[in-house]
C-alpha cells in the first residue's frame, strides 16, 4: 500500500510540474505561493527524496504525512474547488463570463468559433477570480488560528489546483462546443446557454438517490 501511495505521489509531482506553464492561475487561486511553494516545485526533491531506499525510509518515518495527504485526497475527501466558499466565487464569475463571452465585441471578435469562445471563457474566469482574490485555501482562517502550513500540508491544495485547472479547461471547451451551435447564434441565446452549461460542467448535479426497494411480499 505504501509503495502505491509513494508512486502516486511521484506521478502527481510530475503532473504539477507540467502545469507550471499555467502559472497565472496558480497566482490567482493557489495559496502555495504564500508559503513559498511553486507549482513547478518538485515536492519529492524538496523533502530530500532520492533513491528507492530514501523513499521507503520517508514513507516509514517522516513520509507518513505525504502518504496521508495523498490518501485523503484520492479516497473521497471533498475537493477544495468544491467547497461552498470557493464554489460561490466560481458561480458568481460564471455570470461575468457569460456576459463577456456572449458579446461579439469582446475578445477581438474571436468568440464566433468554439476555440476562440473556449479561450474567452477560460481567460474571463481567470480574470474574475483574480479580481475577487479567490483562493482554494482559506487564508483568513489560517491567520485567525495562527497557522503556518508546511509544504507537506499544502500538497493537497496544490493537487486540487491542478485538478481544478483540468476541470476548468475541459468545461470551457465543452461549453463553447455545446453553446456555439453556429456562427450566427444570438448573443442573448449564447449567454443564456453559457451560464448553466459551465456551472453544470464544473459542479454537476449529483444523481438522485435510488428508489427504496419494493416491499417484501413474502413477509405478508
Curated annotation (Swiss-Prot):
Keyword field: Nodulation, Signal
Keyword Signal: yes
Gene Ontology process terms (BP): nodulation
Signal peptide start-end: 1-17
Organs and tissues of expression: Expressed only in infected cells of the nodule.
Residue stretches in coiled coil: none
Assigned protein family: Belongs to the nodulin 20 family.
Protein name per the record: Nodulin-30
Species of provenance: Phaseolus vulgaris (Kidney bean)
